[in-house]
Each structure stands twice: as structure tokens, then as C-alpha cells.
Regions:
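Short amphipathic helix-loop junctions that connect adjacent transmembrane helices
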Residues: 1-13
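Helix-to-loop junctions at the C-terminal end of transmembrane segments
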Residues: 29-41, 126-127
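Cytoplasmic membrane-interface "Motif A"-like loop-to-helix N-cap segments
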Residues: 38-50
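C-terminal ends and interior cores of transmembrane alpha-helices
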Residues: 52-64
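Paired small-residue
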Residues: 67-75
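Intracellular juxtamembrane helix-capping segments at the cytosolic ends
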Residues: 82-95
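A late C-terminal transmembrane helix in Major Facilitator Superfamily
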Residues: 94-129
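Symmetry-related core transmembrane helices of the 12-TM Major Facilitator Superfamily/SLC fold
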Residues: 134-152
Length: 177
């Protein structure tokens, strides 16, 4: 993100502030999405946080700088913070716990590959077009598609299990004598 800001003439200090805001927003996104997932339908929670990211990317694509660019950074960070939480929660609801490890591992692997590809595409886009606008437009389009797909998810296939584990037995410690 810092490269996007400095490319647009933003000072190094403000670019560093944007990075700090992303970090703060990651925490808010992680905690906030986790809390909301306990009370609301997960695709709606994901739409809320990923919609914020889409808005932030669109603001950056529109060439916002100064305070709006800092707000855009925060919005992008919110979705970044919610990604793993919403992914794990929805996998458990739509694929169940029996296949959770496999499904989550595959999804997380794809998530990591997409993150690496995004960085490469951003760099390639800048090298080819001498601007971050084309890759940002592509990312905005991908986010809109993701939001549309999330809005089409139906009811959970697997509910919450309410199994209660028995209390642990006290451990007897020998005196060693």
C-alpha cells in the first residue's frame, strides 16, 4: 500500500501512517468480525467487512489522497482482518467439521496463493501501465464479484453442536518419595 501512496505524491510519513491504520484496522476487523459472527448470518458479516474493503479500494482507484486515502487504508484493513475468521466460520457451517481440516487447508492455501498472485499482479500492472489504477480496478471488480457470490449463499448446511465435555478429573501429583 505504501507504494500506491508514494506513487501518488503522498509523503513517506503519510504512507507510513496509512500502513499503521491498516494494522489497527486488521485488529478491529478480526475482533469485530469474530464478535458479529456469533450473532449474525456469516455471509452478511463477510459482506459488511468485504464491502468496506471494496469501498476502500475504489477510493484508492479514484485517486484519493490525504485524509480520504487514510480512511481508504482503514477500510481495506477491516476486510483484511476479517478474512480468515469469516473463511473458517463459513467453512465449518457449509462443509461441516468432519471435513473441516481438509476444506480449511485447501481454502487457506488458495487464499495464500491469491495473496501472492495479487502482489505480483499489482507490480506487473504498474510496470505495464505505469499506474496502479488498472490493477486496483481489477481488484475492485474481483471484490464486487465476491460480494455477489456471498449474497447468493443459502442457509448453513451444518448447525452449531452443543456437546458439553465432561469436567476434567483432578490430577494426582505424587510427592516423589
Amino acid at each position: 500500500m505504501s507504494a500506491i501512496f508514494t506513487d501518488r505524491g503522498v509523503s513517506a510519513e503519510q504512507a507510513a501512517m496509512a500502513a499503521s491504520l491498516i494494522g489497527a484496522a486488521l485488529i478491529v476487523g478480526r475482533l469485530g468480525s469474530g464478535y458479529l459472527l456469533d450473532y449474525f448470518f456469516a455471509p452478511r458479516v463477510a459482506i459488511l467487512f468485504y464491502g468496506a474493503t471494496t469501498l476502500g479500494l475504489a477510493m484508492l482507484w479514484a485517486g484519493r489522497s490525504g485524509t480520504p486515502a487514510l480512511a481508504a487504508s482503514f477500510l481495506v484493513g477491516l476486510g483484511m482482518g476479517a478474512e480468515v475468521e469469516t473463511m473458517g466460520y463459513m467453512i465449518s457451517r457449509y462443509f461441516g467439521l468432519r471435513a473441516f481440516g481438509t476444506a480449511f487447508g485447501l481454502a487457506f492455501g488458495a487464499f495464500m496463493l491469491a495473496g501472492a498472485a495479487g502482489v505480483l499482479l499489482m507490480g506487473e500492472g504498474y510496470d505495464r501501465f505505469h499506474s496502479y489504477n488498472v490493477p486496483l480496478a481489477g481488484f475492485c471488480g474481483a471484490m464486487v464479484l465476491a460480494l455477489l457470490l456471498l449474497s447468493r449463499l443459502g442457509p448453513y448446511r451444518y448447525g452449531v453442536t452443543r456437546e458439553v465435555s465432561p469436567p476434567l478429573e483432578p490430577v494426582q501429583v505424587s510427592s516423589g518419595a
